[in-house]
């Protein structure tokens, strides 16, 4: 391992170690909301723009994941149809409401809104939309980054029922390189995926204890066909991406 790869691993490990203790109460509150939605046969929607949309994909149809999760996916807020355009789109007021209208978010559901900066129009609008519909809101964001750049703008963290602070620094990248004024090594994805998978694992454990945990099995494992097929049939009506 080179010096810089070692530094990156050490930084991520240190941040995760700190999050395990500092976020424990908030992660438990997030799991409470999601478990309540599952018990009421509601859905957990996950929204993010740019690289944050990867959190929605991570939790969707995932081996070891819960079938109650629904990703909110649209090319205009993702990267594959034009990264520069998506960065512009997420700053337009009113742009994501037509996207959200496709999903039928309702009272008793949960919307997880992922935004590292937590100030762009799209995540703010998504949180407000969820509030209008009676859904609970979990925000995954960097509190430090958001506070640094807010400058009087509404922050996602002010709209959420539960805030999961990913501990990413302003600008996301953590490693200084000699000879460059720019940093490398973004950490928000590694931290965010770990936080959310931990929360959903907690939810799954609770549901298993209650006798009904809709957990997907890896497609290459014996018995996965029947298990996953039954879950797809059960949840297809509320998840257009199955």
Curated annotation (Swiss-Prot):
Q: Which family does it belong to?
A: Belongs to the UPF0309 family.
Name the PROSITE patterns on file.
Answer: SIS
Q: Which NCBIfam families match?
A: PRK02947.1
The UniProt entry, under PANTHER family, shows:
PHOSPHOHEPTOSE ISOMERASE, SEDOHEPTULOSE 7-PHOSPHATE ISOMERASE / DNAA INITIATOR-ASSOCIATING FACTOR FOR REPLICATION INITIATION
GO biological process annotations for this chain's record?
Answer: carbohydrate derivative metabolic process
Name assigned to this protein: UPF0309 protein BAB2_0325
Q: What Gene Ontology molecular function terms does this protein carry?
A: carbohydrate derivative binding
| Span of domain SIS | 30-214
The record's InterPro entries line, in alphabetical order, gives:
RpiR-like_SIS, SIS_dom, SIS_dom_sf, SIS_GmhA/DiaA_subfam, UPF0309
| The organism of origin for this protein | Brucella abortus (strain 2308)
Q: Which domain of life is it from?
A: Bacteria
């Amino acid at each position: 391992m080179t010096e810089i790869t070692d530094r990156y691993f050490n930084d991520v490990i240190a941040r995760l170690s700190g999050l395990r203790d500092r976020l424990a109460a908030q992660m438990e509150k997030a799991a409470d909301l999601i478990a309540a939605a599952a018990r009421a046969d509601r859905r957990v929607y996950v929204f993010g723009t740019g690289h944050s949309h990867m959190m929605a994909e991570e939790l969707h149809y995932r081996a070891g994941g819960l079938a109650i999760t629904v990703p909110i996916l649209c090319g205009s807020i993702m990267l594959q149809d034009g990264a520069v355009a998506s960065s512009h789109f997420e700053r337009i007021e009113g742009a994501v409401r037509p996207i959200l209208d496709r999903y039928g978010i309702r009272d008793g559901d949960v919307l997880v809104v992922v935004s590292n900066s937590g100030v762009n129009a799209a995540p703010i609008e998504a949180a407000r939309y969820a509030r209008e519909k009676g859904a609970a809101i979990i925000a995954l964001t960097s509190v430090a980054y958001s506070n640094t750049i807010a400058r009087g703008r509404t922050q996602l963290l002010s709209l959420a029922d539960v805030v999961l602070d990913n501990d990413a620094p302003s600008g996301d990248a953590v490693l200084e390189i000699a000879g460059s004024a720019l940093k490398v090594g973004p950490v928000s994805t590694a931290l965010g995926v770990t936080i959310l998978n931990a929360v959903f694992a907690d939810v799954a454990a609770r549901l298993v204890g209650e006798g009904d945990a809709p957990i997907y099995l890896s497609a290459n494992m014996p018995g996965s066909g029947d298990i996953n097929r039954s879950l797809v049939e059960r949840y297809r009506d509320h998840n257009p991406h199955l």
